[in-house]
Every structure is written in structure tokens, then in C-alpha cells.
Amino acid sequence: KTAYEIRNCDWSSDVCSSDLTLLAGVAGRVPRVELGTAVLLPALRNPVILAHLVATLDQVSEGRFIMGVGIAADVPNIRAEFEAAGVPFEKRVGRMMEGLRLCKAFWTGDPVNWDGRWKVEDSVLGPTPHRPGGPPIWGGGSAEASLTRAGKHFDGWFPTGPDAAGWGKQWKTVCEAAEAAGRAGAVTGAVYLTVSIDDDAAKADGMINDYLENYYGQPAEIIRRRQACFAGPEAEFTPWLKGYVDAGASHLMVRVVGDHESHIAILAKARDALN
């Protein structure tokens, strides 16, 4: 059954449940599909604990977890989250990258000694991930530094936009960075999209604006400069998605705003048309 049918569950886009805990539950009920975070903020986590949580989730899902990570957009709600966690917002890039390196060290199963932001002495993680070395890590972000970082260090690139043409140009930069690092072809191209499908385009547009402002605590017009959104009729939706596929995206993640049941049927048709 869907969350809508059960009626005592929330859609993941409606509330911010604990990501890895929620995915562990989904992994136990859904045996085939890939699962991922969009995106997890490693800078907010202790990497020793994060490495253990992710390894456990990868075991529960039998290797179906994709670890989407990011440094977080500079918006009021996210700054407030960092402040509440006692983590300096301006240090988030360094914390993320070092934290991920420490996670990967633990995922080898070998004893770990670490002397950096975190101190670790002769420690071993158990269980290790289902996949040797850990799950694939996809990096979000569209800034120039994020593109280079994805090409040099990550297994996938996972931004929230911009439009298909802009995504294609940025994807070229990611691929060039990967090639320069000796990693040609090692990065998966993905994109995270927000959609509201309705014959009344103005209504759909307003729903997206309301959702974004509530979620991020910032005017929608600012958020939409860096996040790709579709608001309009079904007939225009698949061609819009196809623009990203033609630009090189192999994975399309869709955040739905509006009636989820009707959107699921439309997404299924779009998937079949694009395959």
C-alpha cells in the first residue's frame, strides 16, 4: 500500500524524517528499488557514527543505498539547523570532506587511526557495508567548486538544477574534472527536480512557490534560481524531463508537490516513455 492509502504515514517530501532510519524501514519493505538521500549533510554528523549507520543501512538494503551528500545551501532554515547542532556553517566543506574520508577508512574493515578534526585510535567498524568499500557517494551542488569536487572525488553528481541546457554545460565541467583526475567515466550524472503537474499551470506554480518558501524559509523566486522546477500540464512534462536525459542525466529524482497519487501515474508513464 502507499502512504496515502494507509493514511497514518507521511510522504517523505512532506516532513523531514530521520533519513537513514526511514530508509532502513523502506529497505525492509521494498526489496528491489535503489534508495538514497537527497541530500545528507555530513558536516552535521559525527563521521564515526555516520559510518556505522550507513554500513548498517547498506547491509539491510543489500547494497541498494546511494549516499547523496552536500554542503547545504545558504538559506535561513539550514543556517538555523547548523547553529542548533553547534556546527560552524562556514566550516561545512572541510568537515564534509574529512568526514567522508574517515567514513571510507572505516568501511574498509581495517583498523583506523585518525588525527584530524576527529581523533580515532586503532578502531574497527562492524558491520562493514554490503558493498566492499561502501555505497556510491553522489555530491550535490552547482557552484564551480562543487562541480570540480564531484568530478575529482564522488561517484555521482546530483544537483537541483538548473534547466536542462545549464545542467548539460555543468555536466561537461564535472566530466572534465573527472578526466583530469584520472577518473574518466567514473561519475554518474543525476538531477533532483521539483514538479507540480496540473492543467492549471498558475495553480501548480503557486503550489511550488508555497512549498519552497515553507521548506527553505526564503522567497521562492530566490530558491527557483538554483532549483529546477516544472509547473504545468502532463503533456509538457515528459518533453521537459527528456531535456535532462538528452543532456546526459541517467538518474532523475523527482520531488512531487501536489496530489501524490495522480503524480505517481504520470511519473510511471514518463518513465516508460523515456526508457
Regions found by a protein language model. Give the residues of each.
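Flexible, glycine-rich active-site loops centered on histidine and acidic residues
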Residues: 43-113, 165-166, 172
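Aromatic/hydrophobic pocket-lining residues that form the small-molecule binding cavity
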Residues: 19, 23, 50, 92-96, ...
